């Protein structure tokens, strides 16, 4: 069929999924902004650590995407399942490790920014701890998304992630401002709304996966991983993860510098970064689609189709 048409069909839902992720953060900022710039600064500061967590997510995410795409191209579904199993095992271990670090070292981590205002510091710590408790959902959803994208079914994760966004949009005003019987939780409410929405996404992914026997049957997640596939996943994902981690690290240093002028500059930086994300999320959507498309054709040894679409 038409390569351009196939690429756009794959890319548009992936781009949509990227924008859904951005909309999560924007929704939080809109409702938290009603409390004041101090609350936005607290959420923005703690949010750097979830952003840094993306570097960990990218290792099994890229590994799953490429490994599944190439296996599907070769029509080797058993090999695809091996990549799926290893990527899920890896993301669960990384989530537990990173969440433990964030909870144990929460005070020095937030202290890095030299915020100066005790209320902002306490709110940032509260947000960080609540998010850390649900970090496994935040980590595993992009890997499920990558598995479906690698399989060539990008519409499914877009729809599932959209359910999470709608859940978050409903819960944010209820939990942040306190509507009806719910207490006003402010910053804690924003964190709770986010992890509940992410948990809903994980549950829907698991239900969907149960019906996708060609991808998820007999995975045996508790079996020991083999080093060959683990190394390949790390080799595929580490360069992108390192780039993401360095980018976030620089942003954190900038935030530390501007924090000396108070909470408003931090809030402005956080909101500005969300708007800036529109440009690179568009490119990221096409990049992910190309990775899946090239991976499937590489696996199928359809070299001519690779060069045509590049």
Feature names for model-found ranges:
Residues 5-65, 69, 238-258:
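Signature of the first transmembrane helix
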């Amino acid at each position: 069929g038409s390569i351009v048409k196939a690429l756009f069909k794959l890319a548009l839902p992936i781009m949509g999924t990227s924008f859904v992720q951005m909309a999560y953060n924007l929704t939080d900022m809109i409702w938290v902004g009603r409390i004041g710039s101090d609350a936005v600064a607290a959420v923005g500061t703690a949010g750097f650590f979830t952003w840094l967590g993306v570097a960990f997510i990218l290792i099994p995410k890229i590994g799953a995407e490429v490994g599944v795409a190439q296996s599907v191209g070769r029509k080797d579904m058993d090999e695809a399942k091996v990549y799926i199993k290893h990527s899920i095992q890896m993301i669960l271990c990384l989530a537990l490790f990173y969440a433990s670090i964030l909870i144990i070292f929460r005070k020095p981590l937030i202290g890095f920014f030299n915020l100066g205002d005790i209320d902002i510091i306490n709110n940032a710590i509260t947000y960080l701890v609540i998010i850390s408790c649900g970090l496994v959902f935040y980590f595993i959803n992009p890997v499920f998304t990558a598995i479906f994208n690698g399989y060539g079914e990008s519409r499914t994760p877009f729809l599932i992630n959209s359910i999470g966004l709608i859940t978050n949009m409903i819960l944010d005003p209820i939990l942040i401002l306190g509507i009806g019987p719910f207490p006003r939780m402010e910053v804690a409410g924003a964190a709770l709304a986010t992890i509940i929405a992410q948990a809903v996404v994980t549950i829907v992914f698991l239900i969907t996966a149960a019906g996708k026997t060609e991808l998820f049957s007999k995975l045996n997640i508790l079996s020991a991983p083999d080093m060959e596939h683990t190394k390949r996943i790390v080799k595929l994902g580490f360069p992108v993860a390192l780039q993401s981690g360095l980018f976030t690290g620089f942003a954190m240093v900038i935030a530390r510098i501007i924090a000396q002028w108070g909470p408003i500059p931090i809030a402005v930086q956080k909101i500005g970064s969300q708007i800036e994300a529109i440009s690179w999320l568009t490119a990221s959507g096409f990049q992910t689609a190309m990775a899946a498309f090239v991976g499937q054709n590489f696996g199928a040894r359809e070299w001519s189709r690779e060069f045509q679409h590049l």
